[in-house]
C-alpha cells in the first residue's frame, strides 16, 4: 500500500473518531432540575453542565395536574430532578407518574425541607462559584450584581436554586477530577421561558395594570383576601364560572406566540362578537353558570363522602353540559372549539344525567339530609318504605292490645320505633314511680326513662323486631348500596366529565373576551410571525373607561425602519400613557383578545420588557436607581428582534450627566445592532439635550416623536396628539402652575432657570446684595493675593486675625 493511500485512509478514518468523541461529550453532559410547588405556585431552575449555565423560571401559577411542570420536563429532559421531601400531593403524584414511564425515568433526589429554606438559599447563591466576578468583589457588590441577573422576588424559585446549588456541590458536576477546593462554576444566568410562551415579568404586569389587587371594601373580608381593582384582567373577565376565571388568569400569566392557538381563540371571539350570535352567547353563558368544580365532586365520590348538595351539583353540571352540547351543535362546526365540544360532550353525559334523574330523590334527600332513591328503583327498598309508611296505624293497633295486659294504673301507652334500637312500648311515668325499682312491671323489660315516659321491651315488640326488623337502618343501608353503585357508574365514565371541565372553561373564557369586545368596541387584530406592528387609532383600554374623552393615536414599527421611537414632551402630556397603551394592546393580542384600535396588525413578540416603575423590594436592599439599572440591564441583555421594550424616563434617578450618558449609551447599543436584532422600542425622556447635542448615531431605525401642546396666553393646553418632531421646552413652569404651586415660587423658578441657562450669577433673595458688599469681597480677595504663602516668616494666624477678619467679618 502506498504512502498516499495510508495518509488518505487516516484522513477518512479520523473524522468518525472525532464525531464519536463529540457524541460522547454530548452524552456526558448533565441537566439537573430543582423544583418546588406550593399553593398553586411553581418555582424551578435547572443547571446545564454543557455550558455551565443556570436557567431559572420566576414563580408562576400551575394547576393541580402540574401541566406547566410537565411541559418543562418535556422540553428540558433533566437527568436529575431535585425536590423537597415535604411536598404537596400533586407533586407526589407527578413524581410517581414519571417513575411509571418506561421511556423516561430521571433520577429523583429529595432533600429535607430545611435545605429549601429561603435565607439558606440566598446565602448559597451569594457563595456560589462565579468565575466571571473578580475575586476581591465585596458581598454588597455581589448582591448588586446578582440582583441584575436573577429575580429576588420569586421565593419558590430562590429556594429551588439553593437546593440545586447544594446538589451541585455534593455531586461536583463537571469538576469531579478537580481539587475539592474548586467549586462547580456558573458562567451565566438565563431566564427560562417555555416554547411559544411570551416573557412578561412582574414589574411589567404591575406597571401596565394587567393585574391590580386591592383590599376588599367589605369589613368582613378584609382579612380573608383581596379583590381585583381597575386592571386589564378585571375589565376582560366576564366569566360565568370560577374555573373559567382561573383559566383566563392562566392565559394572562402565560401569553403565547403560538399562532395556531391564537387563531383558534380568535375565531371563537369573532363569532360571538357578532351581534346576530348574541342569543347563542346568552344561552351558553346561562348554562355555564351551573357548571361546578368537577374534580372536587369526583374526588368526593371516590372517597364516598358525597353529600346531597354534591349530587345536585353533579346533576346540574351534567344537565347543563348536555344543553351546551345541543346548543353548540347548531353552531358552525368549522370552528374548531365547537367541533371539539360537539364530539367531546359524548352521550355518556346524557346517560349520567338520566341515570341520576331516575335514581336520586332530591326532595326526599333534602328532607332527610341523606341520599334517598326514587320509587321503582329497587323493589326491596320500595317494600321497606311501604311498611314504614303503614307502620303508624299498625303500631296504634298493637298498642291498644298491649294496654289490655298492663297494670290498671297505666292510663295509656304507645308503641314506638327507634332506629338501631327497634320497637318499644312507651308508657307515662306515674307519681308513685320514684325509684328504679318502681319501674319494674311484670312481663316487661325496662329499657330507659326519657321525658317522663318509661320505655319497655315486651314480647310483642320482640316479635315486631323479628318480623319487621330495623326498617329504617335496613332502608338506609340499601339506599347507600344504590348510591355506591351509582358512584361507581359515574366514576367509570368520568373521562367525559373532565372534557366538560376543560372545554367549558375555554368556551367561558372566549365568550368573556367576546363580551368585552362588544361592550368596549374592540377590533380583531391580524396576527402574523413577521416583525411589524401597525396600530391605527389605538386607545388605552383602561383610561378610555375613566375619561369622557380619549384621543386615539397610531403606532407603526416596521422590520427595518423606525423601530426605536424617542418621545419627548412636557410632563402630563401623555407620554407614559402612550407607552402603556401600546404595551397593553400587544399583550391583549397575545392572549387572543380583540384590541382597542380601528385596525391592528401585530407581529408576535417573544417578550415585553419595561423600565417604567421602580418596584422596591425589602428582600434586596437596592436603591431606586439601582432597581432602574437592573430593569434596563435585563432589557438590554435579554431582548431580541422580536421583543417589545418600553422605557419611561430612564436616568432621572441620578446625576443629570450620568443619567443622560447611560441613556444615550443604551440607545446606541440597540441602534448599532443589525436591524433583525433590534426590538420594538418606545422611549420617553425629558433629557432634551440627548437630541440637541447629537449624542445618538444617525440611523433609519430611529424615529423622533412628540405630543402636541398649545400655549394660550400663560396657559398650557395638552392636545395628546402624537406627531413627528422634538419638544423644545419642558414647560415645567406651566405644569407647576397647573399643579397648584404658588405663583411667586413658579416665578422664582423661571428666573433661576434663565440665569442658569445663560451662565449668569444666581443672586440670593433672602438678603439684599449691595455694591458695598461686592467691594468688600474684592478687597478680601486682593489681600489674599498679596500674601506670599511660601514665605516661612509670614504668620498666617496673625494675618487672618488682624487683617482679614476685621475687613471681611460682616460677609460671614
Regions found by a protein language model. Give the residues of each.
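Charged catalytic and DNA/RNA-contacting regions of genome-maintenance
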Residues: 1-271, 286-302, 306-397, 698
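Conserved phosphate/pyrophosphate-binding and hydrolysis machinery centered on Walker-type P-loop NTPases
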Residues: 154, 225-226, 255-259, 281-291, ...
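ATPase nucleotide-binding head domains, primarily ABC-like/P-loop NTPase cores
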Residues: 154, 238, 433-464, 510-812
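Secondary-structure edge/capping motif, primarily at the C-terminal ends of alpha-helices
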Residues: 272-279, 298-305, 328-332, 402-406, ...
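Amphipathic heptad-repeat alpha-helical coiled-coil/stalk segments that mediate oligomerization
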Residues: 319-390, 417-455, 509-570
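Flexible, glycine/threonine-enriched loop-and-boundary segments that flank and lead into catalytic domains
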Residues: 394-412, 523, 540, 548-550
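Charged, surface-exposed helical/loop "interaction arms" that form contiguous linear patches used
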Residues: 474-528
Amino acid at each position: 500500500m502506498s504512502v498516499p493511500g495510508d495518509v488518505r485512509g487516516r484522513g477518512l478514518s479520523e473524522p468518525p473518531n472525532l464525531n464519536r468523541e463529540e457524541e460522547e461529550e454530548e452524552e456526558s453532559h448533565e441537566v439537573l432540575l430543582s423544583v418546588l410547588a406550593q399553593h398553586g405556585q411553581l418555582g424551578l431552575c435547572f443547571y446545564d453542565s454543557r455550558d455551565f449555565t443556570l436557567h431559572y423560571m420566576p414563580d408562576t401559577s400551575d394547576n393541580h395536574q402540574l401541566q406547566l411542570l410537565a411541559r418543562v420536563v418535556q422540553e428540558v429532559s433533566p437527568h436529575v430532578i431535585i425536590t423537597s421531601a415535604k411536598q404537596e400531593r400533586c407533586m407526589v403524584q407527578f413524581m410517581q407518574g414519571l417513575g411509571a414511564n418506561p421511556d423516561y425515568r430521571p433520577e429523583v433526589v429529595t432533600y429535607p425541607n430545611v435545605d429549601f429554606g429561603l435565607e439558606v438559599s440566598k446565602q448559597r447563591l451569594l457563595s456560589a462559584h462565579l468565575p466571571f466576578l473578580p475575586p476581591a468583589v465585596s458581598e454588597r457588590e455581589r448582591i448588586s450584581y446578582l440582583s441584575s441577573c436573577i429575580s429576588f422576588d420569586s421565593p419558590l424559585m430562590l429556594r429551588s436554586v439553593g437546593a440545586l446549588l447544594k446538589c451541585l456541590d455534593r455531586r461536583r458536576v463537571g469538576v469531579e477530577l478537580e481539587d475539592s477546593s474548586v467549586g462547580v462554576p456558573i458562567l451565566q444566568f438565563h431566564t427560562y421561558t417555555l416554547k411559544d410562551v411570551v416573557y412578561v415579568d412582574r414589574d411589567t404586569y404591575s406597571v401596565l395594570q394587567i393585574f391590580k389587587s386591592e383590599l376588599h371594601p367589605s369589613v368582613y373580608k378584609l382579612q380573608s383576601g383581596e379583590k381585583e381593582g381597575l386592571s386589564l384582567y378585571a375589565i376582560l373577565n366576564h366569566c360565568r364560572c370560577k374555573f373559567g376565571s382561573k383559566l383566563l388568569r392562566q392565559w394572562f400569566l402565560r401569553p403565547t406566540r403560538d399562532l395556531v392557538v391564537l387563531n383558534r381563540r380568535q375565531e371563537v371571539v369573532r363569532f360571538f362578537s357578532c351581534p346576530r350570535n348574541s342569543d347563542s352567547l346568552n344561552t351558553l353563558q346561562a348554562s355555564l353558570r351551573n357548571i361546578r368544580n368537577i374534580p372536587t365532586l369526583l374526588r368526593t365520590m371516590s372517597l364516598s363522602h358525597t353529600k346531597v348538595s354534591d349530587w345536585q351539583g353533579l346533576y346540574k353540571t351534567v344537565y347543563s353540559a348536555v344543553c351546551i352540547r345541543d346548543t353548540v351543535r347548531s353552531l358552525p362546526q368549522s370552528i374548531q372549539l365547537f367541533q371539539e365540544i360537539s364530539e367531546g360532550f359524548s352521550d355518556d353525559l346524557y346517560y349520567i344525567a338520566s341515570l341520576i334523574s331516575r335514581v336520586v330523590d332530591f326532595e326526599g334527600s333534602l328532607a332527610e339530609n341523606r341520599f334517598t332513591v326514587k320509587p321503582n328503583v329497587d323493589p326491596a327498598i320500595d317494600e321497606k318504605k311501604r311498611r314504614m309508611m303503614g307502620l303508624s296505624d299498625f303500631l296504634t293497633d298493637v298498642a291498644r292490645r298491649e294496654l289490655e295486659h298492663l297494670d290498671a294504673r297505666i292510663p295509656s301507652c304507645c308503641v314506638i320505633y327507634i332506629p338501631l334500637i327497634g320497637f318499644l312500648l312507651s308508657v307515662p311515668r306515674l307519681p308513685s314511680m320514684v325509684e328504679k325499682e318502681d319501674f319494674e312491671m311484670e312481663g316487661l323489660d325496662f329499657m330507659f326513662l326519657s321525658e317522663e315516659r318509661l320505655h319497655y321491651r315486651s314480647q310483642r315488640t320482640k316479635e315486631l323486631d323479628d318480623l319487621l326488623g330495623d326498617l329504617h337502618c335496613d332502608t338506609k343501608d340499601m339506599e347507600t348500596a344504590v348510591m355506591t353503585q351509582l358512584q361507581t357508574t359515574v366514576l367509570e365514565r368520568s373521562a367525559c366529565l373532565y372534557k366538560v371541565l376543560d372545554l367549558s372553561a375555554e368556551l367561558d373564557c372566549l365568550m368573556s373576551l367576546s363580551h368585552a369586545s362588544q361592550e368596549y368596541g374592540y377590533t380583531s387584530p391580524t396576527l402574523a410571525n413577521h416583525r411589524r406592528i401597525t396600530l391605527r387609532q389605538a386607545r388605552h383600554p383602561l383610561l378610555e373607561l375613566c375619561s369622557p374623552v380619549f384621543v386615539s393615536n397610531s403606532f407603526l414599527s416596521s422590520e427595518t425602519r423606525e423601530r426605536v421611537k424617542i418621545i419627548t414632551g412636557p410632563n402630563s402630556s401623555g407620554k407614559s400613557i402612550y407607552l402603556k397603551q401600546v404595551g397593553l394592546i400587544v399583550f391583549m393580542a397575545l392572549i387572543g383578545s380583540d384590541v382597542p384600535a380601528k385596525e391592528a396588525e401585530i407581529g408576535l413578540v417573544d417578550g415585553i420588557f419595561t423600565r417604567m416603575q421602580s418596584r422596591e423590594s425589602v428582600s434586596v436592599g437596592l436603591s431606586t436607581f439601582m432597581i432602574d439599572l437592573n430593569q434596563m440591564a435585563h432589557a438590554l441583555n435579554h431582548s431580541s428582534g422580536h421583543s417589545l421594550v418600553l422605557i419611561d424616563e430612564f436616568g432621572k434617578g441620578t446625576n443629570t450627566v450620568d443619567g443622560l450618558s447611560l441613556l444615550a449609551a443604551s440607545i446606541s447599543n440597540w441602534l448599532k445592532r443589525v436591524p433583525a436584532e433590534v426590538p420594538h422600542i418606545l422611549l420617553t425622556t425629558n433629557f432634551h439635550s440627548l437630541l440637541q447635542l447629537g449624542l445618538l448615531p444617525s440611523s433609519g431605525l430611529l424615529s423622533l416623536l412628540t405630543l402636541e401642546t398649545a400655549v394660550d396666553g400663560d396657559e398650557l393646553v395638552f392636545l395628546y396628539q402624537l406627531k413627528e418632531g422634538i419638544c423644545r421646552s419642558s414647560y415645567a413652569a406651566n405644569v407647576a402652575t397647573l399643579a397648584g404651586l404658588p405663583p411667586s415660587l413658579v416665578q422664582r423658578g423661571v428666573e433661576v432657570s434663565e440665569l442658569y441657562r445663560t451662565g449668569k450669577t444666581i443672586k440670593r433673595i433672602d438678603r439684599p446684595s449691595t455694591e458695598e458688599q461686592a467691594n468688600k469681597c474684592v478687597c478680601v480677595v486682593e489681600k489674599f493675593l498679596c500674601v506670599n504663602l511660601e514665605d516661612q516668616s509670614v504668620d498666617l494666624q496673625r494675618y487672618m486675625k488682624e487683617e482679614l477678619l476685621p475687613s471681611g467679618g460682616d460677609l460671614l
